[in-house]
């Protein structure tokens, strides 16, 4: 409410989208406190990724121009496509709204694939060696690719392969959301502190560990359930054996 009041007083229409995202996050948080379910957590991740889609535009412009400057192309200017930014945020918002309303799985699946395609379109603007030579650009690209892969898996899961649903959600929550928050905060922190834009070793290690954790959790989601079920079955067998032995 305070942020919305400041935006209204400053008459800055460019921040209205962030106010909407903050409102949605607050709504999801209140709903989860009243009814803690996995579906609400999934909507919170989707809304956070909408915020990522909006913030990425400014972050991408900063790292793109820095990459050109570091590569000796300071006369060039990098400007991300604002239309793909808006389209990706709108389609993801539509998917989150449709999923919250309990639409049929095929509808959600096609919208998830549309979301993946919209974010994949944003990757095209980075397909230049002048940009990809910079390590922070490669990190940004890798996390964005994880987001595309996550919604692709989610769409496939909701169109008929439900075994991919849990891996997709783990990939989105860890390798997309958490990793992108790390990238954005590290880049924004250096820029606002007046420091040179560098991809420090500790940040690289943190990002690598998050990506590895997300991918391993994605690949091992079903395996972990099988191991858990096996352990539970073995415990039950042991209890039955000892009960028969004692009595």
What label would you give each PLM region?
Residues 1-247:
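Hydrophobic alpha-helical transmembrane segments of multi-pass integral membrane proteins
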């Amino acid at each position: 409410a305070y942020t919305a009041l400041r935006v209204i007083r400053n008459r800055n229409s460019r921040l209205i989208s962030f106010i909407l995202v903050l409102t949605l996050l607050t709504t999801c948080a209140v709903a989860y406190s009243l009814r803690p379910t996995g579906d609400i957590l999934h909507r919170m991740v989707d809304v956070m990724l909408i915020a990522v889609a909006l913030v990425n535009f400014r972050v991408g412009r900063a790292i793109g121009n820095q990459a050109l400057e570091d590569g000796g192309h300071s006369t060039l200017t990098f400007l991300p496509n604002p239309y793909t930014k808006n389209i990706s945020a709108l389609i993801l918002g539509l998917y989150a709204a449709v999923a919250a309303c309990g639409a049929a799985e095929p509808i959600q699946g096609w919208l998830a694939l549309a979301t993946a395609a919209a974010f994949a379109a944003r990757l095209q603007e980075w397909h230049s060696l002048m940009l990809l030579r910079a390590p922070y650009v490669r990190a940004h690209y890798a996390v964005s690719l994880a987001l595309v892969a996550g919604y692709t898996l989610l769409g496939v899961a909701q169109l008929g392969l439900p075994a991919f649903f849990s891996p997709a959600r783990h990939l989105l929550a860890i390798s997309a959301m958490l990793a992108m928050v790390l990238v954005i905060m590290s880049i924004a922190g250096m820029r606002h502190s007046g420091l040179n834009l560098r991809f420090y070793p500790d940040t690289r290690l943190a990002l690598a560990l998050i990506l590895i954790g997300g991918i391993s959790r994605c690949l091992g989601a079903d395996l972990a359930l099988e191991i858990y079920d096996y352990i539970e079955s073995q415990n039950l067998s042991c209890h039955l054996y000892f009960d028969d032995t004692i009595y």
